[in-house]
Structures are given as C-alpha cells and as structure tokens.
C-alpha cells in the first residue's frame, strides 16, 4: 500500500537544462533508441482490435494498450509492475509508454536522407563536391559512380552510364570499382578525410583569385568544418536504419461501422516495410540485378515520401488522391507542430462572451457574468466548500455547485474578491490587448467593459467578443495585479501618450459643457464659489455656456517642503470663466491649475489634460480623474440632448455659382484640346485640378457657414460666435466625424477614384443632403467596395509584417543597467521644406544624454551625460534654443545579447527609465505593427493637382536672423547682376545671434539668390526663387557656343510652338534615334574664347563640355555669345514623368526588408573630384579622382539625371545620380548613424501621413536587429572564413578571445539584412525553424550540430520554460546563481576531502550542464 501512495507522490521533476542541441543520429544511436524491430506492415487485427505482433502497433515493442495489463491478460494489477509476460512478451507498465517508445526498421539497402539531398543547397552535393543532378542519377539507379579508380585513367566520383560501365569493365576488368545507388554514395562519404579536405580548402582559398571559386570553396569549407567541429560523420546522411515513431503519435482510431481512421504516417510506414521486405526476399533469392535495382529505387522513394512527401517527384497519395502528410509536413507551416502546438496553445480556465458597456465600473474593474464566474472558478469553490465543511468530498461539492445553492454564490463572492482576471480581445496587436481587471459579478450573460479601456483594446460595443482568463498561481495573480491591471497601464507603449482618453459621447459632453456662448442667460454674474454656481444652474438661473466670474479654490504644490507640511495648499482666485467649466473644476486633481480646464475641451485637449495630470499628479490621481471625467462627460452629454437632423446640414448658397464656374473652365479646356493646344494628359490633369479646387472651395464656403452663427450681445450689437450646430460640434470636438465627412453631407462629394486608383474626371457635384442620382451613385460604389476589399487585404498584410517584426526582435531584452558606451547619435528637429515636422523636444524626450548639454549663452553644463531627459529638461533645452543634443540609442548599445537600460531610455508605457528584463524588442515590433492596419495599401500616383501643389518655387525665412550658406553652396553672377546657384546640394541656413541654426532650406540648381551669405533678415523675407516648371542647364563660363553632335533629325528634333511660332531644338530619346551610330553620341556644347580656342576648366587640360539630357529644350543657337550664368537649355519638369510613390504598408515593409530599389540613385564611393570620361554605348562615364589620384569609374545610363558637373568636389556617400536611395549603399558609405536616420525618417513619413505617432526608438531597435550580422573581411587567427556572415556578438566574443590570447582578431564590415533574412539567420535554430523554411533551417542546424542557448523568448516558449524577460529573467538569473554557488560548495567539499586523504589533487572539472539532445 505504501508503494502505491508513494507512486502518487512522485511528481515527475522536469529536468533543468540550459541549451538544446540538434545533430544527426548514427545508425547505432537509432538502434539504441529502439525497443524492437518492426518487421510486418500489419497494424491491428480488425476482429479483435488487438495489435499484430511485430507490426506497426506491436505491444511487445511499444508497450501495453491498458495500464499495467499485458496483452493476453495473464498479468493485471500494479503488483506485477515491470514483469515481462512470457506468453505475449509484453512488459506490464503504463500505457503512456506507447507515446515514448520508438521502434526501428533495418533497411535491406541503405537509403539517402532526402533533406540532405534535396534541401538547397544540397549538403550531400557540397560534401562530395558533385552536382545534385549527378548524385540523384546515382541514387535513383540511372548511373554508376566510380568509387576506386585503381590504375585506370578514370577519376574518383566520375559518373558513367550503364553502357559506359560495361565498356569500361571490358576494357579494364576488375581494376576499378563503380557502384550505383545509396551504397555507392555511402562508400564515397566514408572515404572522405575531412581534416585533410579542410586543410586543402583553406590553402586553396588563400591562393585563388577568382570570385566564383572563393564563393564555392567558402561554402564547402563551411559545411566540412561543421562536420569536423560537431563530430558528425558524413555517411550518417545515408540511412541504414529507419526509426519508427511511437504508435500513439500516429494513432489508428476505429470508427463506427468497422472502418478505421488512421494517420497518414501509418500508410507511409506500411509502404516502406512492404518494399523493404520484398527487397530482402529478392536478395535472398539472388534475383536478377535489374529487378533488385528497381526494388531498391522504390524503397528509396518510399523513405523519401515518409520523410518529406512531395519534395522529389510526385507526392504519394492515399485512396482519396490527396497527398499524404509526411513527417516534415507535421512540423512546418501554420498548422505544424511549431506554430500550432508549441507557440499557440489552448488555455484552461478561460471563457468568452460578448462585451457591453459598463459605465458604472471603476477603471480597474470588469463585469463578469455570474454563470461564467461559477464555471471559471470551480476548483476554488470546491476547495472552499470542503474547507468550510459544507461538502465532504469533491463529488459532493460538485453537486452543490451544480444545484447553485445560495451558499455557493456567497463563496463565489469570496473567492473572486481580489482575484484579478485577464481580458483579451483578438486580434491582440500590442500588449494592451490583454489587461487584468478585478471581476464584479453581474446578472446576464455579457461581460461589462469600462469605456475608457476601449481605445487600448480597440473595442466597440457592436457585437465584439472578449475572452477571460484566470491566473491561477499566486505569482500569476501578483503579476496580473501589479503589471497588467488596467489602472497600471494608462500609457501607450508606442508613443507614451495616455491610452485612457475619452471618446465619442464623453468628449461631446465635456466639449458642450466647456463651450462659451455670447449673451447666455445670467452672463456677467459673479459667484463666491462653485457650489453657488451649481445651485444657480440647477435652478435654471444660468445656462451652461454663460460667461460668469467665479472664485475657484485650487490645490497647488506647497513651496514649504519642511517636515509635517501638507503637500498641497489651497489658493483662491477669481476667474472669468463659464458655468460648465466652473462645475467641472470640482473634479480637478490636486496639483493641477484651473487654467487647464478653462478652455473648450476638444479630444486633443482632453488627451493633453490627462497627460499633464499623469506627469504632475502621478498615476493614482490620474486614474481617478479620468474616471470622473468619464462620469461627467456621460452626464453632461445626456443633459445637453444634442441630436442631428437633415436641416443641420447647411448647404452653402454659393455652391451653384462655384460649380457653374468650374464647368465653364472645363469646357474651355475641352475646346483647347480639340484645337490641339494641349495634350490629352494635360487636359485631364487640368480638369482634375479644377474639380479638386472646386470641391475645396465649396467645402470651405460650407465650413464658414457652419462654423459661426450671428448673435446679439448684451449691448445689442450684432456679432458672430462659434456655432452651436450639432453636426459642427461633433466634428469640432473630435467626438465623431470630420470636416471631410461633413463636406460630403453638405458640400459636394467631389472626385471619385476608379478601382485601379485613377481619378474619374467627372466629379459628384451633389451631396448627401441633396441626394445622388443614379450615375453618381454608381460611381461612388467603386470606392466603397474597393474600401472593403482593401481592408481585408490590409489586415492580412499588416499581420504578416507584425509577425516578421516580432520574429526579428523577439530575443532583444534589457539585460543590464548601463553598457557604458560613449557613442550616440546627434538629434536635431526634423525639418521638411522649412517646416518643423517634429520638434527636437519630441525626439529627445525620454532619452539619455551621451554628452553634456551646455547652455549656449553661459557655457555652463545644464545636464551631465547620463541624464535621462524628462519633460522639464526638454522644455528647458527648447527654451534655451539648443538645436542639437547627442543622445544614447539602441543602435550603438554595446551590450552583447540584449540592450542596456541607458541606451534605451524611458519605458514609454510606464513613464520612467526602462526596467531590466523588459522585452523591448517585442514592444518595438508591436508598436510598429499595431497601427499597420491604419496605413493605406495603395501606391500613390502623384499627378495633376497633387504634384503641382507639391512644387515650391521659392524659399522664405520663417524667423529673423542671419543668412548662412553651407560649404556646398556655389553660385555665379550673371550679366544682369543676379546670383545664380550652380550647386546641386547647396543649403541656406538662418542662424540667430549666437550662431545657432534656426532653420535650413535646400536651394535647387538654377535658383536666383535674393539674399547673400551674412545678410541680416526679417522673418518672411524671400531667400531665393526659381522656375518650378523647368530645370535649367547653366554655363559657368562665358564664350561662343559651339554645338557638337547636335544634328536635326538625328539627336535633336525641331519643335514649333503653336502659339508663338518660335522653333526650339529638343534632344530626342536614344531609343527613338535611327542609326546605330547616333545612339552612342551625346549632344553637347563646347565654348570657344575670342581666339577660337576651346575654353578649358581652370587648372586642367580638359575642355569645358556641357551635355544635354534627353528632353532638354536647347535655347541657344550655334555660334551665339553667352555670358557666365546664362541658360543654355531647359528641361521641362513635366518630362520627368510622375513617378509612383510607394506609400503605406508596402513602403514600410520595403524599408524593413532592406530591398534595394530599382533605378537606385548612385552615391559617390570616395571623396574626390568629378570628371566625365568617354561615353560608351547608351551609358555616360563619370570618373571620380580621389585625393591620392586613383580613379573610380561609374557607368550611368544616358536617361539618368546626373547631379554633379565637371570638376566638382564630391564627398564620399554624396548622391551623384538621382534616384531613390539604396539603404545598403548608405550603410556602406555613410555608416550606421546615417542609415538609421534614413530608415527612421522614411518609416516615420509613412506613419505621420496617417497621423500615427510612434517613437523613433522602436524603429531604431528594429534597425539594430537588422544590423546584427557582420561580414568577415579578414579572418585574422579566428575560426571564421573571409566573406562569411556571422552574428555580431559571436564575432566580438571571438575577437576578445583572440586579443586575450595575443592573436590577430578578425576585421569586418557591417551588413544590413531584411527582417525576414535576419529572423532566419539567428543563432537560435528553434526560433528560425518556427518562423519560415523549417526544413532548410533544421537541415543546416543538424549538420552543424548546433546548440541553441535558449536566449530568446520564442525558443523558451517552445521548450516550455519561463521566458527570460520580466520576472522570468530574474528567475533564470537566480537559478544560475544558485547553481554556480552549489557547484563552488561541491568543489570546496571535494577539495577538503581530497586533502584529508593526502591523495594527489587532480584539477576539479566543472560539471557542465548537459545539453538536452
């Protein structure tokens, strides 16, 4: 009996392990796993349902069917445990061993493992140095391979056909050996001496010069070294023994009616066994070679299908023509083992239901239906019932609960008290998608949710469902309460803004209450306090919006900081305010001034208000305040009684005339087009322009009319005040709707797009109040349907982007406080087109300064390096006008395997410095992925209005100051005395008196400068102007024009202007030129001086050559005198076709995948002077001579726009040919900082367009992960191979080791990988395999004998350990510390013992943690 009780006590202790290793199994290893050989293909006897002996389900091999009972029934009961029945040979034990015991099949002929053969690049091919095609021919018995050439002229591994073989046998007899099939390949593999091969390859690598060979050798070397290091023998890639999966993992289930449902694996195994047995028999019978060969080939194919069906040839199919699911299919893909069972498990103690609004709840509560709670907390209730003695057994308790007796409800209340539950709404796109609440029991069947947390869950009450989960253990409850409780998560981790902002009716109520009206009832009255105002309002003496004077008591921070002094003291002030605002002042938290409420509260204002409360009053007060705001908002909205009707949509009276005028203009353009003055494209662009301007004008007229209304003030004068129109108030407050939607209701609907994105040129002139006619309705259906289709696509794409981002960053966790680096990036305000898009304060808030921040006026240090810049700091920095701050960034963090808190800065979701253990990688991925669904999917065609609006024609200063030009600015003075810019990348800056940069503007080539360097100017002064429609070609030298290759009809064509009748020459496109000869020439101009000599570039022997691009209109004549700064030709900007701008989600994906754009711009590889070399066919040759005098050539297609001209000095990394930038080039030539700035700015552009705020540091975290691999350029004395890509941390560790040993470290280049590539190339094979390309990843890992140190989150989830983040990080740290201290104690005791016996002391070996196989 005691043994029985002990048995129940033994809880299987899970083994503690720190790593998992994968490798190739040797045949002996497979046999050692096996409990017996499966000899027969039979499964179970269909009459008795007992497994057949020696078959696939044999009880003798795999274990008993029933617990502690042998097959024939001779031994039953526990007492026979471990006995092997002599009748049926079955061991008496637990039936669950059928899930663990494996069998094996001895193959009659060896078989190649298809993964190592067919998974590209073929591992077998690499080891043998043969092509995949050749190996396949040998394996599938189509050709012979020479094993030992002997004394013959044949070479080893040579392939020969059967015919060849017989001829050679006749010629040389048995001097040589050739084989076919897997035996042959196995012999070749056995013959390989790996160490020797590695040596030869290393020497070959050093001595060879050809790129292709280096690549090939390096690849082979990598595979061979892997075998060498892991101790795996190459011949193990050929199987002699096939393991058989335990039968419970490939079950056979009897259905009713005598049929069976079976796993496909059983079919596949049966086929292998049948063919194997047939082959054995044929070999015994000494059958003819050709029959045996065919059988061997069939066996190879059967094993192939079992391992990876469909990898080679046609997939094996079952009875219903469906391909069978092989072992490989079991683990890969969304339904495979990794993603279905290991990363996404079903959860006990959970339920789901529809959500309804719970306006009476506190922020940290949720309403839980009683029945649901009863079910979820059942075990807790059973326990309580037993403890209280209401029920004696679990069974009795169960009955009690099922009958729902009153005592059960009381106990439920008790159990639920202070026991948080977690609510989750799918899709969980960021961490706020799961939050913890304290349950409040309610009647009904729907979960009640607090309205303020809806924004975080992205929930609404139109039928959304949510799931409830119960944290069981004490630790889980504690974490849920401290970390996940809704009232502790009030900020968005993406940008640090409050997530508990009111929306819709709350906003409307607050807005209505804080508006002011002219001449409201009781205007001008004075009140002694808020209570008096409330009394007057309740008695209808005053209206909500009336202006009154009120004495208001504010609680302000106490200046007196001494002991026992109260933190807040009252301060009484008389405010001119409105009744509504005075009433709201009641709920103001201590420490906030009344001024924050003394304005109309729109949605943005309320968000700012809550943010201020959080920063000034702390979390607790903010949560209470938000709750009270919500209550007030609902109450006031109800009291306001706002509703809308058709009459609220006021159509502007000017609409008719505006639309009429537009129609006239359109007719005029049609007429011009008919008479051939404009092209069809121009006409279309103009028409679209007119209509979009018209709908703007109508919209503006409508808004003007809606937004104000005439009133009479107290003195009887007519004035206008902001309107109380319901529709206007809803849009203005941010409660619902927008100006655009109102425009469709009361203005005109405007232009519509076709499904392909092009705009239909006839707009919808009606609005919804007037109603649409049939045609208009039909046109608008396009857009509506496309919207729905787009949304569906977008969700999938956005989800996939998030998945890739999470995968690449999942192992990035904050692991230490400070890595001590002195690197960082310089942050400036982000300026575009002279506008400040993102202020400096927003970019440095919550970052750690890396250099001292100095007051520019007094030169004293304001903030030392290492200071976390909070709100007060950034406000001070902004006030002093500091325009650049160097801050720490995740990109330059020197922590290996993780990040440090200082480089990351503030945890945006908590508002303080990030904690060690925070999974910042996943947070970054979620912050970028979550708003993905709000981005657009389409590619924008910028044409017509949009492109014209985007073109500027001048720059003007926004602030007073002094003009300064950058070093790259060059200009010449023309005959009229104007300064003409001839540099491509010149910029003008405005600096203040202290020389601090205030703004910066690009000044394009050909602009006329109106202010020169050093001029003092006022805000609003124009700095430069230019013609936006054409780009000029300007001469920097004077002289007589001499044309070269300018031949009419060959390189140029004459164009006659319809209106003026003047003729100009236009350079024709290369493709349209007739003869071959004329394709390679380039029309250009040389200048002659007074003596008829060619004008030279000063200081060189080169003549001045000015080339004309395709489409240029040449404005000078041959032989004409020109002055410096004169225009030789103009290139119409229209000729630069409207280029498609990839926007939205595809653009973000493109950036993170680090794709090189097609037609990328070219950057200068070196710093030097440019010149043009001899042109080749269709290409121009640009030469850069560096400072040492070396020449670097670039070949550039003729139609590309070169941004530099002769003899210009360019810097390394400067753009010399126009086009989209290639991130890889930026990294190579400008470094990590420039790359990060490029990616961050580009990604932010996309999100900013949609009004989404994301903090830069999230994008930087992802860029860090994209840069985590390096390419070895010189391997020094390390184990790396030149050209190999390795993990940065590995390389740094190895280099540290080399330096410690006094050897030569490796040198390397940074490599930028796209997120998919980066995820697949992580060190953890478990994580990579669960992401994509499972087969390839596992094949590679097995050969390398890779060890996964379980550093990331994903690997740990998969093996079922606590993840090394948050509390899990602390847990693992503590565990490892305890292990090492235990080990030290063990060593110490061992040493003492050894000393006592006077035995010679041997060095104690550290017991290493065994890696689980």
From Swiss-Prot:
GO biological process terms on file: DNA-templated transcription
Function per UniProt: DNA-dependent RNA polymerase catalyzes the transcription of DNA into RNA using the four ribonucleoside triphosphates as substrates.
GO molecular function: DNA binding; DNA-directed RNA polymerase activity; magnesium ion binding; zinc ion binding
Cofactor dependency: Mg(2+); Zn(2+)
Residues the record lists as binding Zn(2+) 1: 70, 72, 85, 88
Keyword Transmembrane (UniProt): no
Class of the enzyme per the UniProt entry, highest EC level: transferase
Gene3D superfamilies: 1.10.132.30, 1.10.150.390, 1.10.1790.20, 1.10.40.90, 2.40.40.20, 2.40.50.100, RNA polymerase II, clamp domain (4.10.860.120), RNA polymerase Rpb1, domain 3 (1.10.274.100)
Keywords of this entry: DNA-directed RNA polymerase, Magnesium, Metal-binding, Nucleotidyltransferase, Transcription, Transferase, Zinc
CC cofactor note: Binds 1 Mg(2+) ion per subunit.
Organism of derivation: Burkholderia cenocepacia (strain HI2424)
Similarity remark: Belongs to the RNA polymerase beta' chain family.
UniProt gene name: rpoC
Protein name (Swiss-Prot/TrEMBL): DNA-directed RNA polymerase subunit beta'
Entry-linked HAMAP family: RNApol_bact_RpoC
């Amino acid at each position: 009996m005691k043994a029985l009780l002990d048995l129940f006590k033994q809880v299987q202790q899970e083994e503690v392990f720190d790593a998992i290793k994968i490798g190739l199994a040797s045949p002996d290893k497979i046999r050692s796993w096996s409990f017996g050989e499966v000899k027969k293909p039979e499964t179970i006897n269909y009459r008795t349902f007992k497994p057949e002996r020696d078959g696939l389900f044999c009880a003798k091999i795999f274990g008993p069917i029933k617990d502690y009972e042998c097959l024939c029934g001779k031994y039953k009961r526990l007492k026979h445990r471990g006995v092997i029945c002599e009748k049926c040979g079955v061991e008496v034990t637990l039936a669950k061993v059928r899930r663990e015991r494996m069998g094996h099949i001895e193959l009659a002929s060896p078989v190649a493992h298809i993964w190592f053969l067919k998974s590209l690049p073929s591992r077998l091919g690499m080891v043998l140095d043969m092509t995949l095609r050749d190996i396949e021919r040998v394996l599938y018995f189509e050709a012979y391979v020479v094993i030992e050439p002997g004394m013959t002229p044949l070479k080893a591994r040579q392939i020969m056909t059967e015919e060849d073989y017989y001829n050679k046998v006749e010629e040389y007899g048995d001097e040589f050996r050739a084989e076919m099939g897997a035996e042959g390949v196995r012999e070749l593999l056995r013959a390989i001496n790996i160490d020797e091969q590695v040596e030869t390859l290393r020497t070959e690598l050093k001595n060879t010069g050809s790129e292709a060979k280096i690549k090939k050798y390096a690849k082979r070397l990598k595979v061979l070294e892997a075998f060498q290091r892991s101790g795996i023998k190459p011949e193990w890639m050929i199987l002699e023994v096939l393991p058989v999966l335990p039968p419970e993992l490939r079950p056979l289930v009897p259905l009713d009616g005598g049929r069976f449902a079976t796993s496909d694996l059983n079919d596949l195994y049966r086929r292998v066994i049948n063919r194997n047995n047939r082959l054995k028999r044929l070999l015994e019978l000494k059958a003819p070679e050709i029959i045996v060969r065919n059988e061997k080939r069939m066996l190879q194919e059967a094993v192939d299908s079992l391992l990876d069906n469909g990898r080679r040839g046609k997939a094996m199919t079952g009875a219903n023509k469906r391909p069978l699911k092989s072992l490989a299919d079991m683990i890969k893909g969304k339904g495979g083992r990794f993603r279905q069972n290991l990363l996404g498990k079903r959860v006990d103690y959970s339920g789901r239901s529809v959500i309804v609004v719970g306006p009476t709840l506190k922020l940290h509560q949720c309403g839980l239906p009683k029945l649901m709670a009863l079910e979820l907390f059942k075990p807790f209730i059973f326990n309580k019932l037993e403890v209280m003695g209401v029920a004696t057994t679990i069974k009795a308790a169960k009955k009690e609960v099922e009958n729902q007796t009153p005592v059960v409800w009381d106990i439920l209340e008790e159990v639920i008290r202070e026991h948080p539950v977690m609510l989750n709404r799918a899709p969980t796109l960021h961490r706020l998608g799961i939050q913890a609440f304290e349950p409040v029991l309610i009647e009904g069947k729907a979960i009640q949710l607090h309205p303020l947390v809806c924004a975080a869950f992205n929930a609404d009450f139109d039928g959304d469902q949510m799931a409830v989960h119960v944290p069981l253990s004490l630790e889980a409850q504690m974490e849920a309460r401290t970390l996940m409780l809704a009232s502790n998560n009030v900020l968005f981790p993406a940008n640090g803004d409050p997530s508990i902002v009111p929306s819709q009716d709350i906003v409307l109520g607050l807005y209505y209450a804080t508006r002011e009206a002219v001449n409201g009832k009781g205007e001008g009255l004075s009140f002694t306090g808020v209570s008096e105002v409330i009394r007057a309002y309740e008695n209808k003496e005053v209206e909500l919006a009336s202006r009154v004077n009120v004495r208001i008591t504010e609680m302000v921070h106490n200046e007196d900081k001494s002991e026992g002094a109260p933190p807040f003291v009252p301060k009484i002030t008389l405010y001119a305010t409105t009744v509504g605002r005075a009433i709201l002042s009641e709920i103001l938290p201590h420490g906030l001034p009344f001024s924050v409420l003394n304005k109309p509260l729109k949605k943005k204002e309320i968000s700012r208000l809550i943010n201020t409360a959080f920063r000034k009053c702390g979390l607790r007060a903010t949560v209470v305040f938000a709750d009270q705001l919500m209550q007030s908002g609902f109450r006031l909205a109800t009291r306001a009684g706002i509703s809308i009707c058709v009459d609220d949509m006021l159509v502007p009276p000017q609409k008719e005339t505006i639309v009429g005028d537009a129609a006239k203009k359109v007719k005029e353009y049609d007429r011009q087009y008919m008479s051939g003055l404009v092209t069809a494209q121009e006409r279309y662009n103009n028409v679209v322009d007119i209509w979009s301007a018209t709908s703007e004008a109508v919209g503006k007229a409508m808004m003007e009319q809606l937004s104000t209304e005439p009133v009479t003030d107290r003195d009887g004068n007519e004035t206008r005040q902001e309107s109380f129109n319901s529709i206007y108030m809803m849009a203005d407050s941010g409660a619902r709707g927008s100006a655009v939607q109102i425009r469709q209701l009361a203005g005109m609907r405007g232009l519509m797009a076709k499904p392909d994105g092009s705009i239909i040129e006839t707009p919808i002139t009606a609005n919804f109040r007037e109603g649409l006619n049939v045609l208009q309705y039909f046109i608008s259906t396009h857009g509506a349907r496309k919207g729905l289709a787009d949304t569906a696509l977008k969700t999938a794409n956005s989800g996939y982007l998030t998945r890739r981002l999470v995968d690449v960053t999942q192992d990035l966790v904050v692991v230490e406080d400070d890595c001590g680096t002195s690197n960082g990036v310089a942050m400036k305000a982000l300026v575009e087109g002279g506008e400040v898009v993102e202020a400096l304060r927003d970019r440095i808030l919550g970052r750690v300064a890396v250099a001292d921040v100095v007051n520019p006026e007094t030169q004293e240090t304001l903030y030392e390096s290492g200071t976390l810049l909070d709100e007060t700091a950034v406000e001070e920095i902004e006030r002093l006008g500091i325009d650049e701050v160097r801050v720490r960034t995740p990109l330059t963090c020197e922590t290996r395997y993780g990040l440090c808190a200082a480089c990351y800065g503030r945890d945006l979701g908590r508002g303080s410095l990030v904690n060690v253990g925070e999974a910042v990688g996943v947070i970054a991925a979620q912050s970028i992925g979550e708003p993905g669904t709000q981005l657009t999917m389409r590619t924008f065609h910028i044409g017509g209005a949009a492109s014209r609006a985007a073109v500027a024609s001048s720059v003007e200063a926004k602030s007073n100051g002094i003009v300064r030009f950058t070093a790259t600015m060059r200009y010449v003075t023309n005959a009229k005395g104007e300064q003409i810019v001839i540099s491509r990348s010149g910029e003008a800056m405005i600096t203040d008196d202290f020389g601090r940069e205030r703004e910066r503007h690009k000044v394009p080539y050909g602009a006329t400068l109106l202010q020169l360097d050093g001029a003092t100017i006022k805000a609003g002064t124009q700095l430069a102007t230019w013609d936006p429609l054409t780009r000029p070609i300007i001469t920097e030298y004077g002289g007589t024009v001499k044309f070269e290759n300018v031949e009419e009809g060959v390189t140029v064509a004459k164009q006659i202007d319809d209106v003026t009748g003047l003729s100009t020459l236009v350079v024709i496109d290369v493709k349209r030129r007739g003869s071959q000869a004329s394709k390679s020439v380039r029309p250009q101009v040389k200048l002659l001086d007074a003596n008829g000599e060619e004008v030279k570039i000063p200081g060189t022997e080169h003549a001045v050559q000015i080339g004309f691009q395709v489409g240029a209109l040449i404005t000078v004549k041959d032989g004409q005198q020109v002055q410096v700064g004169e225009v030789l030709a103009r290139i119409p900007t229209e000729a630069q076709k409207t280029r498609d701008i990839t926007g939205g989600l595809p653009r973000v994906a493109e950036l993170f995948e680090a794709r090189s754009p097609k037609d990328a711009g070219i950057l200068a590889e070196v710093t030097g002077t440019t010149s043009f070399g001899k042109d080749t066919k269709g290409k121009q040759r640009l030469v850069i001579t560096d400072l040492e005098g070396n020449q670097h050539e670039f070949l550039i297609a003729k139609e590309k726009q070169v941004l530099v001209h002769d003899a210009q000095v360019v810097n390394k990394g400067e753009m010399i040919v126009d086009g989209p930038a290639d991130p890889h080039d930026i990294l190579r030539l400008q470094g990590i900082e420039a790359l990060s700035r490029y990616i961050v700015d580009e990604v932010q552009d996309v999100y900013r367009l949609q009004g989404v705020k994301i903090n830069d540091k999230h994008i930087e975290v992802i860029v860090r992960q994209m840069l985590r691999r390096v390419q070895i350029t010189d391997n020094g004395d390390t184990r790396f191979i030149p050209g190999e890509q390795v993990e940065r941390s590995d390389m740094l560790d190895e280099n540290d080791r080399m330096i410690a040993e006094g050897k030569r470290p490796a040198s390397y280049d940074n490599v930028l990988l796209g997120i998919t590539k980066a995820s697949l190339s992580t060190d953890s094979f478990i994580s990579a395999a669960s992401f994509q390309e499972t087969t390839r990843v596992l094949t590679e890992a097995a050969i390398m004998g890779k060890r996964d140190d379980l550093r990331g989150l994903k690997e740990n989830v998969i093996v079922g350990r606590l993840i090394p983040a948050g509390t899990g990080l602390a847990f693992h740290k503590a565990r490892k510390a305890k292990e090492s201290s235990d080990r030290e104690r063990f060593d110490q005791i061992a040493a003492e013992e050894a000393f006592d016996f006077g035995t010679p002391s041997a060095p104690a070996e550290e017991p290493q943690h065994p890696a689980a196989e």
